[in-house]
């Protein structure tokens, strides 16, 4: 819609001046919901009002007419804005905040009584640019990302920033890993070129990851423009000042800085030079695996029951965010992993220190986000007080270390606590200037201590003791005139005045007494002193608020000068919180320090699933631990056994142990020896993907295909029931070929759970594959799941027993047992007519051997396969050939 069409639609020419102002601003922000400040309310008009009233559940009313058209209107109180913004941001709306830039009095002085108050948009709030504490999750980052695809389309550059903490990063990502990297970061908003709107990438980001995409015109990412933006922002002459970065990284960084400038109206906090991330320095965990393992959220997207929720006993918000980042990005460098483990071990060996530090950390605040609000002029006195309390607690924490160790601390601990020495100058500045009861709103006044500035003290004295000052002046005039009955009074017409009776008028001789009014019984005067006092009393509140704002701004500028130190302090405190947390959970839940190797070891003794164990503990139940011994020579465990026996839990727990170990934490086991895992892939369970029109089987095959394409020798794969979403013959064939491919081609560690007992024969000719099963105890028709993993293969699935446990009617269970008995007779050559009367879906290995069966054809086909020579594409084509035999 062009400007002319817009004005015509809203009858611009006959609108009031105020409504014309609104329409001018709205046209400049058509993609936003515009909140227009009108006195004590933010109001919305026309379509915005209709939309907002529905989303926010507030009344829709009218604001007169514009021509013949009624103007829809709704509004929210300015002091409750954050509550309503929360709902709008949750619904992914882009919100433009339009504020009054002058008071009505200033507008009147500028342009007369008909002048419209000057207004303009002061910021645009989007999901990726929030800094308000009440609008963002405290225990996780709030990333805005910009994604730029390289010209060869083999890699992408990703810049991501957390505006609330002023952190910015840039990374190059292989094309096949883009979705996995986005899944790691979980950005609230992604900037993408308009040219990619109809691409498969954009479709996957929206449908698979459900992330918000904000499209920008292609020129928004232009290299020359973005380079200039970077140089201007960081006041550099050469882009090399950023480091060794690619053209696409320049575009990603520049576009994100430009977007921040547009949404924050140039009011961007000082961001450090982007930290260049090596993609391969973190374990790759694809989005499906993150969902399956429930690492930072459960399958419903909430915290309860997730690994993060189980491990998170941090006591600070910034510590919680750091733990979130650790779990999202496990390390792959042995030296860095061991460095973290050594820190954890130090605190585990000093639990008394841990206890004291955790209590002191509770007295600190989220100074990262406080500092950002200060630099963006959106802070309150509470933010400064938070910094003060944190500085005080930090010095005490450092004292705890030196009380215990003196100057004999390990270097890696000394490095962490170095910033805890504090900053006496900064502490004293805040302590001497900011009142302990400072309000949240600067306009309320009362933020600066009276003694910090003499003028503040004077103005507050006037506000608090105005009557005493008037009384003092009255006493002075009584003494000067000799009129004991002299009074100082007030009315709304002439304000303060000196009131004497008519008979005493001859005693007023001093010309400083200026006649104002004569009544029947009295004469009224004023003086220059009284007029000055009256003016000061009338303006004291306004003057003190104005002065306090000036002083507050100066104090904030002095705090900003210490920004680098405060960020180091925040990093130190969050690190202490996380490693004390690791020590705490190691002691609380009996975790052990893992050992890392550079081979394919995965030797876990008495491993446990931390989330399940914690849940059982609440019910006073014990978790059944299990060993897992993978190595170069025994890379694949093929696990058979019934449902409910614990196969999936066993698979998940070992993947989780690898993740926990590589973030630098102790692990739930008696011992753990692990060769570093570069990638973890999990295919456990699937639901029909109705949004993308994919069945369970298609979803499973897509996930399995991605695993086979992206895994390396150092990866860990956990697969559960591959092939179960199709017929028995297809399923066994697919599972068989997948196992062969992992064994012969990938040669990586793998836990493979299945109901296809026919696969267990593969251990006869795949030397690195071993059979394991779940121990069962039978008593008549009853079975007991022991949950122990033991060497060997299951001889049957116990499906009917599980059905009985699930509560199926007894008649159904009895009938199922009768049919099973007939099937079992069929497989031994008896009851030959059962196939036609009961089922045609028997196991392919149980059909009659004296006929030319599908099984024999499959056997013949398998004998001609050369697994080492098959590409993934050829393997998939082979699957379709096998299907034709059915």
Curated annotation (Swiss-Prot):
HAMAP family: MutS. The gene is mutS. Belongs to the DNA mismatch repair MutS family. PANTHER family: DNA MISMATCH REPAIR PROTEIN MSH1, MITOCHONDRIAL (PTHR11361:SF34), DNA MISMATCH REPAIR PROTEIN MUTS FAMILY MEMBER (PTHR11361). Keywords: ATP-binding, DNA damage, DNA repair, DNA-binding, Nucleotide-binding. Transmembrane segments: none annotated. SMART domains: MUTSac (SM00534), MUTSd (SM00533). Disulfide bonds: none annotated. The keyword Coiled coil does not apply. This protein is involved in the repair of mismatches in DNA. It is possible that it carries out the mismatch recognition step. This protein has a weak ATPase activity. CDD domains: ABC_MutS1 (cd03284). GO terms for biological process: mismatch repair. GO terms for molecular function: ATP binding; ATP-dependent DNA damage sensor activity; damaged DNA binding; mismatched DNA binding. This is DNA mismatch repair protein MutS. NCBIfam families: mutS1, PRK05399.1. It comes from the Bacteria. ATP binds at residues 641-648.
């Amino acid at each position: 819609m062009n400007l002319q069409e817009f004005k015509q639609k809203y009858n611009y020419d006959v609108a009031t001046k105020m409504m014309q102002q609104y329409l001018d601003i709205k046209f400049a922000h058509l993609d936003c919901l515009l909140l227009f400040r009108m006195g004590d309310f933010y109001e919305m008009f026309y379509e915005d009002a209709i939309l907002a009233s529905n989303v926010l559940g507030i009344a829709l009313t009218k604001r007169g007419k514009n021509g013949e058209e009624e103007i829809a209107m709704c509004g929210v109180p300015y002091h409750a804005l954050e509550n309503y913004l929360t709902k709008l941001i949750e619904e992914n709306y882009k919100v433009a905040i339009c504020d009054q830039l002058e008071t009505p009095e200033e507008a009147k002085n500028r342009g007369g009584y008909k002048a419209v108050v000057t207004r303009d948009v002061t910021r645009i709030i989007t999901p990726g640019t929030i800094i308000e504490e009440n609008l963002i999750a405290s225990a996780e980052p709030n990333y805005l990302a910009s994604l730029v695809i390289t010209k060869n389309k083999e890699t992408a550059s990703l810049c991501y920033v957390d505006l609330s903490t002023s952190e910015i990063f840039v990374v190059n990502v292989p094309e096949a890993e883009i979705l996995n990297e986005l899944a790691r970061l979980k950005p609230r908003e992604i900037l993408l070129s308009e040219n990619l709107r109809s691409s498969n990438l954009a479709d996957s980001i929206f449908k698979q990851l459900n992330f918000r995409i904000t499209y920008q015109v292609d020129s928004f990412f232009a290299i020359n423009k973005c380079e200039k933006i970077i140089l201007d922002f960081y006041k550099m002459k050469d882009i090399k000042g950023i480091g060794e970065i690619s053209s696409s990284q320049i575009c990603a960084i520049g576009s994100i800085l430009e977007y921040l400038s547009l949404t924050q109206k140039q009011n961007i906090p000082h961001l450090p030079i982007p930290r260049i991330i090596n993609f391969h320095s973190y374990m790759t965990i694809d989005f499906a695996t993150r969902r399956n393992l429930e690492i930072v959220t459960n399958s419903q997207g909430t915290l309860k029951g997730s690994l993060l929720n189980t491990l998170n006993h941090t006591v600070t918000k910034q510590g919680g965010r750091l733990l979130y980042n650790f779990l999202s990005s496990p390390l792959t460098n042995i030296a860095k992993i061991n460095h973290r483990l050594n820190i954890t071990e130090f605190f585990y060996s000093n639990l008394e220190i841990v206890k004291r530090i955790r209590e002191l950390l509770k007295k600190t605040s989220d100074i990262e986000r406080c500092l950002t609000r200060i630099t963006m002029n959106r802070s309150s006195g509470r933010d400064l007080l938070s910094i003060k309390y944190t500085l005080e607690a930090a010095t005490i924490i450092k004292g705890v270390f030196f009380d215990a160790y003196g100057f004999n601390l390990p270097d890696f601990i000394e490095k962490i606590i170095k910033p805890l020495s504090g900053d006496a100058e900064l502490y004293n500045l805040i302590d001497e200037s900011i009142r302990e009861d400072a309000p949240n709103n600067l306009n309320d006044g009362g933020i600066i201590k009276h003694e910090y500035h003499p003028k503040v003290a004077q103005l507050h004295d006037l506000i608090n003791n105005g009557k005493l000052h008037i009384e003092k002046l009255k006493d002075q005039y009584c003494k000067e005139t000799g009129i004991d009955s002299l009074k100082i009074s007030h009315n709304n017409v002439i304000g303060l005045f000196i009131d004497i009776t008519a008979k005493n008028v001859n005693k007023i001789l001093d010309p400083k007494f200026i006649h104002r009014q004569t009544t029947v019984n009295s004469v009224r005067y004023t003086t220059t002193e009284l007029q000055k006092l009256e003016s000061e009393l009338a303006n004291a509140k306004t003057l003190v608020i104005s002065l306090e704002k000036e002083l507050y701004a100066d104090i904030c500028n002095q705090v900003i000068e210490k920004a680098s130190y405060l960020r180091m302090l925040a990093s130190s405190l969050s690190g202490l919180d996380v490693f004390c947390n690791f020590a705490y959970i190691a002691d609380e839940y009996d975790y052990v320090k893992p050992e890392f190797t550079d081979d394919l070891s995965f030797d876990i003794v008495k491993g446990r699933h931390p989330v399940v164990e914690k849940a059982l503990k609440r019910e006073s139940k014990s978790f059944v631990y299990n060993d897992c011994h993978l190595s170069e020579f025994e890379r694949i465990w093929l696990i058979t056994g019934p449902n409910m026996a614990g196969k999936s839990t066993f698979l998940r727990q070992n993947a989780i142990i690898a993740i926990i170990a590589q973030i630098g934490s102790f692990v739930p086991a008696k011992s753990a020896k692990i060769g570093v895992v570069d990638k973890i892939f999990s295919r456990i369970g699937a639901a029909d993907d109705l949004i993308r029109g994919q069945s369970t089987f298609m979803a499973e095959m897509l996930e399995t295909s991605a695993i086979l394409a992206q895994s390396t020798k150092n990866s860990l794969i956990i697969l559960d029931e591959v092939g179960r979403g199709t017929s028995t013959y297809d399923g066994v064939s697919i599972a068989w070929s997948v196992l062969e491919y992992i064994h012969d081609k990938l040669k990586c560690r793998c836990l493979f759970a299945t109901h296809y007992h026919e696969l267990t024969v593969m251990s006869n000719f795949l030397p690195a594959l071993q059979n394991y099963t779940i121990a069962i105890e039978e008593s008549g028709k009853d079975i007991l799941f022991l949950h122990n993993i033991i060497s060997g293969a299951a001889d049957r699935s116990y499906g009917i027993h599980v059905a009985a446990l699930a509560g199926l009617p007894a008649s159904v269970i009895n009938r199922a047992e009768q049919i099973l008995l007939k099937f079992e007779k069929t497989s031994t050559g008896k009851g030959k007519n059962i196939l036609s009367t009961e089922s045609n879906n028997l196991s392919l290995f149980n059909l009659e051997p004296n006929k030319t069966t599908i099984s024999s054809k499959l056997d013949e086909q398998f004998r001609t396969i050369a697994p080492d020579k098959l590409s993934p594409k050829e393997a998939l084509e082979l699957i379709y050939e096998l299907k034709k035999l059915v």
